Structure formats: C-alpha cells, structure tokens
C-alpha cells in the first residue's frame, strides 16, 4: 500500500502508520508507566520511520508532550516530523474541566509549544467541546493561531455530527478525530461521509477497539482497566465480538498475517482515512504495528471483512 499520504486539505505529509502516544507519560491513563520506557517508544517510532506522532495535554497532564519534546530535541529531527497534540482540559481544584475559550486555547498552545520544545505545532486539535463556547468561534481561535504560524493545521475531536458541521461553518476544519474500528462503526453513518465530502482527513482512534481486534482475548480474559466498563467487553456482546474476530483471524491466517494488521489495513482502505495512530505500551508492539504497511487487501477481502462486522 502507499506508504505516505497528505492529510486532507493540509500540506502535512505523513506515513500512513503513525504513533498514538498516550502511553508515553500518560500516568493518569495507565498504571505503572515508566518515563524512560515512554521515551524509548518515541525513539523506536523514529527508528522505524514513523513521522506522525499524536499526543495531548491530558496524556499525563503535559508529561507526554514533555517526553516527546526531549526525544525530538535529542535526535534533532523536528523538521522531519508531524506532531499533533490536543487541548481542552484544565485542572480546577483537583478535578478536570473542559475549556474551549479563546484565552484558554491560546494559552494552552503556548504551553504545548514549550513542553514540546518547538516553535510550531503541525496539527492542533480541540480535544473535546466544552458545551459552552460556540464551535465556529473555537475554529476561529485555531485559525488565528494558524495565521500566526503557531500551528500548521486545524483539528477537532469527539464531536457529534451537528457539532462537526458547526465547527466547520467557515470551512476551517482540516482533520477530525473520532472513534472508529471494525467493532465500532457509528462514524460511517454521518461523520465519515461528511469528512469525505468536505476534504477533511479522518483519523480514527481506538483502531483496534482497545485490543479486541488483536485476536488475543478469550471468553475467560479478565480486564482490570477502563475496558471492564465498556459494553463491547461485557457479557453476550463480548462473546459475539470474539466470534467475529475469529472469522477475521481466519482471513489473516490465509494471508499469513496477524489479525491486528488486517484490521488496521482494512481501516486504511476507508474513504477520508489517510493515516492511523495505533498506540503501544512496549517498543515491540510499535514495531509490530508497522508491519501493517505490508498488507494488501483485495476489494473482495475488504468487502468480506466489512460483512463480518456488520
């Protein structure tokens, strides 16, 4: 498959397999994370030819950005990378609140620039809507930052269909991020078609449905993290999903490939999806994700896989 793509209407050229860096410094998301292991993940990504790194303030409340900034500075490769980060969260009296105000987002971008040790951010997303600030106004704030050269492209994440249209009222939106995988296909109803029509690049998160599409789980698998609260990992739904994954596994075996690679390769055949950003907690997982680029799916295989998960 094509190794690189331009993200939608932007001038950002990315390798189609990026790196979702929530396990780099994301101590508030995962137990027992080690900063040096996190930095090794970034180094492994760079060594593997990854040029698209996705992070956010909420990943360790800025720690992920700091660790990425340290490695990028150490390697001297800033100009070769596309770095995406996100903002909207703030700490207030020990709790996390959302803020999309102009003053807050401008301040957050400045803080992200410092943490990442850079003078520009390639792609900046509003991570979540705050439910108060008009979304066209939020997009306008990012347009100001783009015009000033602080960010190169405008992104938004976690919007419903109406919110997506509101954010893009002036046509400023360039990249949109939402949950999408073979297991979770709600985006196909309205979000993906809208992005395709508008020339907006769609970046799916949870592309492996939080590991469900790796084929490594059984009915006896016990989850002790956020997955235990997700419906797709519970009761009959979980068993039903495992049966579908078994069918996907059979397709992968025919192609002498891993189940996860086939699931990711399927995503890269979808309209508007220029790149994906699977996460990893260990360097070997990250190296493994890169093997997806070796998978070629025929049209019949793409349709067969789609039908399994209808």
Curated annotation (Swiss-Prot):
Listed EC numbers: 1.-.-.-
Keywords recorded for this protein, A-Z: NADP, Oxidoreductase
Disulfide cross-links: none
GO CC aspect terms: cytosol
Entries under SUPFAM superfamilies matching the protein: NAD(P)-linked oxidoreductase
Active site (UniProt): 59 (proton donor)
Enzyme class label: oxidoreductase
InterPro entries linked to this entry: AKR, AKR_Detox_Biosynth, NADP_OxRdtase_dom, NADP_OxRdtase_dom_sf
Residues the record lists as binding NADP(+): 206-216
GO molecular function: oxidoreductase activity
Coiled coil segments of this chain: none
Family named by the database record: Belongs to the aldo/keto reductase family. Aldo/keto reductase 2 subfamily.
Protein name: Uncharacterized oxidoreductase YccK
Natural source organism: Bacillus subtilis (strain 168)
Name of the gene: yccK
